[in-house]
């Protein structure tokens, strides 16, 4: 399986990489949060742009991105607008969503974008090609905050992302039972062993799914999300605890 290298970080080799999400409403808070995050132990900074209030002003959005880049120049920056339909803070039209991601790509300030699988096949394919032409990696994602589908469906979605040339396919699902967590882990393992030719990220959410955030190296998930301050999704644990557990499992 090929790895994905962003800056000096090799995703898909060794212990799962830790991603943290920064969620700030304006430029002042972006700056203060970035300064607070700078001291934390993590690998990738995700900027959750759907929390940013002034999305109509692209210059303001990119000014905030510039602050993040300058505050943590060594950290890979993942630009994510999580749509309301997949658990994000704001609804957005497909046209505006694509335009925002293209602006981020054009800025030269971001290393990766998050692109939701169910945005529309043509738009997704075109945006992936546009990102790659500008040396920006694509994390292609799908989130279900209500349920966990069957393993076959989980694998089908991840394979579809791979067929669309995502650099890193990602899926996050809500378990209704402990067996749902096992379904996610089994699907991850099957994808990893039989179909994946690139790193994947999977997780089962909420307290029930916490084990999936820790056991990525065992089952085949290349990264996991931790919290510096406020968790961006149910079930996230602190980056300090997360690094400790990931290191223990890696060295065992």
Curated annotation (Swiss-Prot):
Database matches in PANTHER family: 3-DEHYDROQUINATE DEHYDRATASE
Protein name stated in the entry: 3-dehydroquinate dehydratase
Gene: aroD
Species in which this protein is naturally found: Escherichia coli O9:H4 (strain HS)
Pathways per UniProt: Metabolic intermediate biosynthesis; chorismate biosynthesis; chorismate from D-erythrose 4-phosphate and phosphoenolpyruvate: step 3/7
GO-annotated molecular function: 3-dehydroquinate dehydratase activity
Catalytic activity: 3-dehydroquinate = 3-dehydroshikimate + H2O
Residues at the active site: 143 (proton donor/acceptor), 170 (schiff-base intermediate with substrate)
Swiss-Prot/TrEMBL keywords: Amino-acid biosynthesis, Aromatic amino acid biosynthesis, Lyase, Schiff base
